[in-house]
Design a protein with these regions (language model features):
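N-proximal short alpha-helices
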Residues: 18, 65-66, 70, 148, ...
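N-terminal signal-anchor transmembrane alpha helix
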Residues: 22-54
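Residue-level signature of transmembrane alpha-helical cores of multipass secondary-active transporters
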Residues: 31-35, 39, 79-83, 191-192
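Perimembrane loop-to-helix junctions flanking transmembrane segments
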Residues: 53-75
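Transmembrane helix-loop-helix hairpins at the membrane interface
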Residues: 82-88, 92-232
């Protein structure tokens, strides 16, 4: 237990440390166990807020609204978005940059700027907006890569703030999922972060796995969690 808590803390980050494959699998499996333990605590808190605050204030159950939103995603395309494409895009945005290398920052710039301009990662049709978004995003990422190549001190400065960037990433990742709740009421704005705790927990575990095991492991964990939610 002590070894598990030590591994899943941010006290010691050394993404250059190479773990044997068997050790990686063990830490990955323990991460799933840790996730479910923390999720039980988060769900209990969400239930208490739902019953004793949300309903008392005269609003419908936020927890039920979240479940209804999840049920609307179905079929093979829904599976592709939830289990494959969604986790890949979110990991590229929120986790890749946690190891602040030029290549990673450039890829982050490309994906982030593309989403800002195209407004979604769903590729419904090839049109001028899509092509322009790809061109501008590619140009921006190339400029960022060349800038970091000429000024490596920027990369170093970002690396010194790795823990802070990780925690900010975890919080933003969780808060982003508040948008999945149907019929948002701004009167409940201070309570909605409670319902983002499950995503913050998964985001934290993904972040640690990305930093200590590698990008692929964080992506695999993310996809597995989404798969279980999709099948449920």
């Amino acid at each position: 237990m002590k070894d598990l808590l030590k591994f899943y803390s941010l006290s010691e980050i050394n993404y250059r440390h190479k773990y044997p494959l068997i050790q990686k699998i063990k830490y990955f499996a323990k991460g799933i166990l840790l996730y479910f333990v923390l999720q039980i605590c988060a769900l209990l808190l969400m239930f208490l807020v739902d019953e004793f605050l949300i309903k008392k204030m005269g609003f419908p159950s936020v927890f039920k609204l979240m479940l209804e939103s999840q049920k609307k995603i179905k079929g093979y395309y829904g599976f592709f978005l939830v289990v494959i494409l969604g986790p890949l895009v979110e990991e590229l945005i929120f986790r890749l940059i946690l190891v602040p290398k030029r290549r990673n920052i450039a890829i982050f710039t490309f994906v982030f700027s593309f989403l800002i301009m195209n407004k979604t990662y769903y590729l419904i049709e090839i049109d001028w907006l899509l092509l322009m978004s790809l061109a501008v995003s590619g140009l921006l990422s190339l400029l960022v890569f060349n800038l970091l190549k000429r000024k490596p001190e920027i990369e170093t400065a970002i690396g010194k703030r790795q823990k802070m960037i990780t925690m900010v990433s975890v919080v933003l990742f969780g808060l982003l999922h508040i948008a999945n709740i149907e019929n948002l009421h701004w009167e409940l704005a201070l309570l909605y972060p409670v319902y983002a705790l499950p995503q913050m927990i998964s985001g934290y575990i993904c972040s640690v796995q990305r930093l200590k095991l590698g990008f692929v492991w964080g992506l695999l964990f993310h996809s597995m969690i989404n798969l279980m939610a999709f099948l449920n």
